[in-house]
UniProtKB/Swiss-Prot annotation:
Residues 1-54, 142-162 are annotated as: Disordered. It comes from Homo sapiens. It comes from the Eukaryota. Pfam families: POM121 (PF15229). Residues 34-52 have a biased composition (Low complexity). The gene is POM121L12. This is POM121-like protein 12. Belongs to the POM121 family.
C-alpha cells in the first residue's frame, strides 16, 4: 500500500503541472469541466468561492441601438437605476430640462444658494436650447372697440337696449344712408338764389351782352333781295368764269379756278353742254381759297 501511494501521486503530478495547487474536498467540484490541464487555476479568495466567469453588474444593462431600421451592434453601456426595469429603459432627459436638485439641509435651515444656482443654470440652458417650451400663462387680447361712424346721425348712434349690434350696421349703398351722409356734409348746403351769369345785363354785372352772332353762311342776294334757288328743267349753260367740273373729261383738271364774286349769278344759268350727252355742274365758293388738284 505504501508503494502504491507514491505511484498514484506521481501520476497526479504528471497530470498537473508543477506549482499548480490541487483542489481538494468540495472545491474540486467547482472546477469547470472545459478547463484545460495547462490553464492555471486561481487561488480561492478568503471571502469565499469565486466564479470563473466574470460577474455582470446589476446596475448596467446592454442597450441595442437601431439605425435606419437596422440593428447596429454597440457596446455602449448606460447606467440605470436598480429600481427600474432594464428591459424597458426610459428616455434620457437632457440637462436643460432636468429639475434642479432640492436644497440640502444645513444647521441653519435649507441651503437655498445651490437651488438658486441650479435654477439660474437651468434657465440659461433653456435660453440657449429653447426647444418646445410650453407656457402656463394665457394671454387674452381683447378686440378693439368699434368707433362710431361719422356718417350716422345722432339718433342712429344711440343703441337701443334690446337691439343687437349686428342690426345697427347699415348698408352704405342704400338711399337712406347716402341722404343721411349728404345732409351732414357741409359742402353743397349753400344755395344760390341770384341770377345766372347769362341773365346779368352789362349795366349790373359788367359783363358783355351776348347778342346773336351773324351767320358765316349768308344767302345770295341780288338788288338787296335774297334770291331763292329754284331748280329749272333743262341742261345747264356752260360758263368759263366759275369753278366747273366736267364729268365727261377723262382726266382730272390740274388747276381749278375759283370764280370772282361778281360772277356768282352766272352759276345758275343753264347752258348746252359741249359733250352732248354729258352735263356740266357749276358751283362757287363764297370764301376765296386755293384748291389742290383733288379739291382739298
Amino acid at each position: 500500500m505504501g508503494a502504491a501511494a507514491p505511484a498514484e501521486s506521481a501520476d497526479l503530478g504528471n497530470f498537473w503541472k508543477a506549482g499548480e495547487p490541487l483542489l481538494q474536498g468540495p472545491d474540486a467540484l467547482a472546477a469547470p469541466m472545459s478547463r484545460s490541464p495547462s490553464t492555471p487555476q486561481t487561488t480561492p479568495s478568503p471571502q469565499g468561492r469565486q466564479s470563473p466567469w466574470p460577474l455582470r453588474s446589476l446596475t448596467q444593462s446592454h442597450i441595442q441601438y437601431f439605425q435606419w431600421g437596422r440593428p447596429v451592434p454597440s457596446t455602449h453601456l448606460i447606467e440605470v437605476r436598480p429600481t427600474q426595469d432594464p428591459a424597458k429603459p426610459q428616455r434620457v432627459v437632457s440637462e436643460g430640462w432636468r429639475r434642479p436638485a432640492l436644497p440640502g439641509e444645513t444647521a441653519l435651515g435649507r441651503d437655498l444658494s445651490c437651488a438658486w444656482e441650479g435654477c439660474m443654470k437651468g434657465g440659461l440652458c433653456r435660453a440657449w436650447n429653447p426647444g418646445r417650451t410650453w407656457s402656463p400663462v394665457t394671454i387674452g387680447i381683447a378686440p378693439p372697440e368699434r368707433q362710431e361712424s361719422p356718417w350716422r346721425s345722432p339718433g342712429q348712434r344711440a343703441r337701443p337696449a334690446g337691439r343687437p349690434a349686428a342690426q345697427e350696421l347699415l348698408d352704405p349703398c342704400t338711399r337712406e344712408t347716402l341722404l343721411g351722409a349728404l345732409s351732414q356734409c357741409p359742402k353743397g348746403s349753400a344755395r344760390f338764389d341770384g341770377p345766372l351769369w347769362f341773365e346779368v345785363s352789362d349795366s349790373k354785372g359788367g359783363r358783355r351782352n351776348l347778342q346773336p352772332r351773324p351767320s358765316a353762311f349768308k344767302p345770295l342776294s341780288k338788288n338787296g333781295a335774297v334770291a331763292s334757288f329754284v331748280p329749272r328743267p333743262g341742261p345747264l349753260k356752260p360758263s368759263l368764269g366759275p369753278w366747273s367740273l366736267s364729268f365727261c373729261d377723262d382726266a382730272w383738271p390740274s388747276v381749278l379756278v375759283q370764280p370772282a364774286p361778281s360772277a356768282i349769278w352766272d352759276f345758275w344759268e343753264a347752258t348746252t353742254p359741249s359733250c352732248g350727252s354729258c352735263s356740266r355742274v357749276s358751283f362757287a365758293l363764297e370764301v376765296t381759297q386755293s384748291a389742290g388738284p383733288f379739291g382739298s
